[in-house]
Amino acid sequence: MTDLKASSLRALKLMDLTTLNDDDTDEKVIALCHQAKTPVGNTAAICIYPRFIPIARKTLKEQGTPEIRIATVTNFPHGNDDIEIALAETRAAIAYGADEVDVVFPYRALMAGNEQVGFDLVKACKEACAAANVMLKVIIETGELKDEALIRKASEISIKAGADFIKTSTGKVAVNATPESARIMMEVIRDMGVEKTVGFKPAGGVRTAEDAQKYLAIADELFGADWADARHYRFGASSLLASLLKALGHGDGKSASSY
């Protein structure tokens, strides 16, 4: 197996196969569930809006892949600093049956100098998730923070508040995941000594098998080749799947989605 094939198979099994579009329908989510079951293995999860969780759960069960996890988003994509609304959305997502919640950190508040509200928001959402055995990923929106010190600070605050994962981006702004921001965030995980309990998720802009290989290489360099498993590493993507399957000898590499 070539290096690209090996990394593509790894990446496929770490994907949160995503559709977060305004025109999403039951039919599109059902199709996403079908795509998550591939000839070379399943993606780790799908990521969808909360209202589609019941139809996704039913579809995954019917197609014989109930182990594919269902992730959803809250405080999304705006990252407002209203803790009560973020918490209410997170509780609603849990009630719908989410296995994982990706909440947007109030990054604009941090840019304005307020570190406390981000901590409090993540902590409140974590408490709700922990009570239901739901994993919490925190989206810090690196492409808006831009500054390395702010990316580090948002990562640190999220981890201290209980994040199970830190995630780069919503996929809804001009700049999403970059290898540079990925390295900064994973260095925070390393420097805080939390690599056993905290994972990393690049999202938005990871589109090709070669892209995924680059991101995995950073993780391997920092933590060794065994760290990036589904508990510690995910790719938030949609069009990436077609490229990975093509690298693995399945399909033509074309995809209808751009996330």
UniProtKB/Swiss-Prot annotation:
The active site is at D102 (proton donor/acceptor), K167 (schiff-base intermediate with acetaldehyde), K201 (proton donor/acceptor). Pathway: Carbohydrate degradation; 2-deoxy-D-ribose 1-phosphate degradation; D-glyceraldehyde 3-phosphate and acetaldehyde from 2-deoxy-alpha-D-ribose 1-phosphate: step 2/2. Keywords: Cytoplasm, Lyase, Schiff base. One of its GO terms (biological process) is 2-deoxyribose 1-phosphate catabolic process. It catalyses: 2-deoxy-D-ribose 5-phosphate = D-glyceraldehyde 3-phosphate + acetaldehyde. GO terms for molecular function: deoxyribose-phosphate aldolase activity. It is found in: Cytoplasm. GO terms for cellular component: cytoplasm. Its EC number is 4.1.2.4. SUPFAM superfamilies: Aldolase (SSF51569). The keyword Secreted does not apply. It comes from the Bacteria. Its main location: cytoplasm. The keyword Cytoplasm applies. NCBIfam families: deoC (TIGR00126). Catalyzes a reversible aldol reaction between acetaldehyde and D-glyceraldehyde 3-phosphate to generate 2-deoxy-D-ribose 5-phosphate. Belongs to the DeoC/FbaB aldolase family. DeoC type 2 subfamily. PANTHER family: DEOXYRIBOSE-PHOSPHATE ALDOLASE. This is Deoxyribose-phosphate aldolase. It comes from Escherichia coli O8 (strain IAI1).
